[in-house]
């Protein structure tokens, strides 16, 4: 392990995050606007992903239900990755591609925003769930990677990290989700953004 290898890793990671900050401002703004409108009108946020993206989904839901930086009321959010009984029952009876779709069919309301995370943009179970969310009338956001894959064309906001190295995509997704939390708290709970 060399100093150069360590420094190179962090430089490459900075480059990816900086690129998102330069090139994805409009998509970030659109996402926060959708989320703000959803939460103001009594909707909830449903979020999902696989593997590391499942962990990111749970982290984001925890920040909304708990708090991010500001002491404030809880915000309704559900990570569709957490109920092992539902995941295994649906996976066993219907197949892995249906594990999130069935939950969308059970839980989603047209006021909701559904977020799908996929570093490849090709996760079938996320694709099917977002398709179901569109049918319900939800707004949809894709936090994707690489070229956005099949999911990019079916979401209201396509926020693709233009990178092929999965760990860098996941780190950028985490930064974007933290930014969502920060901006949502400011929009919903500070005098300049608050409408209540």
Curated annotation (Swiss-Prot):
Keywords recorded for this protein, A-Z: Carbohydrate metabolism, Cytoplasm, Isomerase, Metal-binding, Zinc
Enzyme kind, highest EC tier: isomerase
Family annotation (CDD domains): SIS_GmhA
The keyword Phosphoprotein is assigned to this record: no
Alphabetical list of InterPro entries matching this protein: GmhA/DiaA, Phosphoheptose_Isoase, SIS_dom, SIS_dom_sf, SIS_GmhA/DiaA_subfam
Keyword Methyltransferase: no
Catalytic activity, as annotated: 2 D-sedoheptulose 7-phosphate = D-glycero-alpha-D-manno-heptose 7-phosphate + D-glycero-beta-D-manno-heptose 7-phosphate
Gene3D superfamilies linked: Glucose-6-phosphate isomerase like protein, domain 1 (3.40.50.10490)
Annotated pathway: Carbohydrate biosynthesis; D-glycero-D-manno-heptose 7-phosphate biosynthesis; D-glycero-alpha-D-manno-heptose 7-phosphate and D-glycero-beta-D-manno-heptose 7-phosphate from sedoheptulose 7-phosphate: step 1/1
UniProt domain SIS: residue ranges: 35-194
GO BP annotation list: carbohydrate metabolic process; D-glycero-D-manno-heptose 7-phosphate biosynthetic process
Cofactor(s) for this UniProt protein: Zn(2+)
Positions of Zn(2+) binding: 59, 63, 170, 178
EC numbers: 5.3.1.28
Compartments where found: Cytoplasm
Any single GO CC term annotated in Swiss-Prot or TrEMBL for this entry: cytoplasm
GO MF, one example: zinc ion binding
Family: Belongs to the SIS family. GmhA subfamily.
Other facts noted in the record for this chain: The reaction produces a racemic mixture of D-glycero-alpha-D-manno-heptose 7-phosphate and D-glycero-beta-D-manno-heptose 7-phosphate.
Function: Catalyzes the isomerization of sedoheptulose 7-phosphate in D-glycero-D-manno-heptose 7-phosphate.
Name of this protein: Phosphoheptose isomerase
Gene field: gmhA
């Amino acid at each position: 392990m060399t100093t150069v290898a360590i420094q190179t890793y962090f430089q490459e990671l900075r480059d990816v995050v900086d690129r998102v900050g330069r090139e994805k401002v409009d998509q970030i703004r659109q996402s926060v606007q959708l989320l703000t409108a959803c939460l103001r009108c009594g909707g909830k946020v449903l979020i999902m992903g696989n593997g590391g993206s499942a962990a990111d989904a749970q982290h984001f839901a925890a920040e909304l239900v708990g708090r991010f930086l500001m002491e404030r009321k809880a915000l309704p959010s559900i990570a569709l990755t957490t109920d092992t009984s539902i995941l295994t029952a649906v996976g066993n009876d219907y197949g892995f591609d249906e594990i999130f779709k069935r939950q969308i069919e059970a839980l989603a309301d047209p006021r909701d925003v559904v977020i799908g995370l996929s570093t490849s943009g090709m996760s079938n179970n996320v694709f099917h769930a977002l398709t179901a969310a569109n049918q319900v009338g939800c707004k949809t956001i894709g936090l994707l990677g690489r070229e956005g894959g099949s999911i990019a064309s079916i979401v209201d906001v396509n926020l693709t990290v233009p990178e092929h190295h999965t760990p860098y995509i996941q780190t950028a997704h985490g930064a974007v989700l933290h930014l969502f939390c920060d901006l949502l708290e400011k929009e919903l709970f500070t005098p300049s953004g608050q409408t209540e």
